[in-house]
Amino acid sequence: MDKMADVLGRVGAWCGQNKYLSAIKNSFQTFMPLTIAGAIGVLWCNVLVNADSGLGMFWKPIMALEVINPAFAAMQFATISCITVGITFGIAQEIGEANGETGYFAGLLGLACWLAVTQSGWANYALVDTAKQTLELTADGALQTFTGVAGGALGATGLFTGMIVGVVSVEIFCALRKVEGLKLKMPETVPPGVARAFEVLIPAVITLAIIALIGRGCELATGLYLNDVISTYIQGPLGAIGSTIPGVIIIYIIIGLFWLVGIHGNNMLSAVKEALFTPLMLENIETFSKTNDAKSDELHIFAMAWLQMFGEFGGSGVTIGLVISILVFSKREDNRTIAGISLVPGLFNINETVTFGIPMVLNPILGIPFVLAPIATLAVGYILTVIGFCPKAVINTPWTTPPILHGFLTTGANIMGAVSQAIAIVVSILVYVPFLIAYERYQNKQAAEAAE
């Protein structure tokens, strides 16, 4: 156990000090309030004020509010559908700060570099025959081209490109900033803000040119924009690897092992989870906003909110199952006291009280279900989703949303989502109970030996 703790401790220290992982984690955490705001927009348009599949089917008066649906749809577009803009800026800014840059120029440069490699024009066609799906160029057959960023690149599809370009561009810029010959020195009479603008001018121009040339080279070599290449050959395969039950299980085993040596496992793997599962969640939200069907085959199962729904209720290790087990089955007053204190925080998915109060750290008995319980609940959730009993995750909810309510909201206000999460809670209790009994026997034995 000590050897494992030492190895995981070194890995955890490396993860915590790695500026790239920290930049990804911090950027997604900073953007989270906007993601939730966008999810509220989806909830309003698709679940509440919707006459086809929402509350409007059963309570017609609410449809009087339909006139403001476009405003809530705009909330979704400005946040979820444009997440790459915010994440690219955030990651570039974080990398700049890690390299000693002040102000927000690094973020602006990263965003400009991403725009330089993103499709910015398309042909306008008119649909002539809907039945045959034939297309004809508008304006008497003349090609009409419009400038502007391709909408698909703004959302989940462009996320990996934005992350990569945000990191690479600012690293190039910071390296060039160290070259004294590239700094334009201005007279002391020039205001500091203007002087700094000229100081970074040449490194910024070179950086932007390098990234733009890479994008153009990619287009000439492959016939595809850089975003399409990254989305197809990097983001797609990584998502495919992560969005499998073995991949998810491995991630949650590692999270549990980190916790058992006193390291916040979710923080350590936050960047990995965000990169793999947030794009899938965003695609689910987009699809649901168009189909209103939370069981559509187009939706991904392993989206971020789904993982939180089945693998993190009550906190890491799904410890709400342990808290309930103690309150129902424990015969030791000390454990019951800790569980009583931990119940309310646990209902909001905050579990440090029970994790460090029992404690779970370096606990060879309760450490086993701490790792196994999330695997069991994820497996059950996967089965329930595959057979169509549980809808898929289509709405982002705050991570502090209580279990069962979380399942209800995440699945588009579907009662079967709440029922499915309740089943997962029962499964977590069943996993913890036998180990709790064994642990209390061990505690009693230790107490008896100490009394002799």
Describe each PLM feature range.
Residues 215-216, 220-330:
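Membrane-embedded translocation segments of transport machinery
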Residues 70-87, 154-161, 241-261, 296-317, ...:
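Hydrophobic alpha-helical transmembrane segments
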Residues 186-198, 233-238, 357-359, 364-365:
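Membrane-interface segments at loop-to-transmembrane junctions
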Residues 37, 80, 84, 88, ...:
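Alpha-helical transmembrane segments in multi-pass membrane proteins
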Residues 5-28, 65-69, 186-196, 353-355:
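Cytosolic juxtamembrane amphipathic/interface segments immediately preceding
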Residues 39-64, 123-136, 218-237, 264-280, ...:
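Interfacial/capping segments of alpha-helical transmembrane domains
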Residues 17-183, 361:
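Early transmembrane hairpin of solute transport permeases
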Residues 1-15, 50, 54-66, 138, ...:
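Transmembrane alpha-helical segments and their short flanking loops
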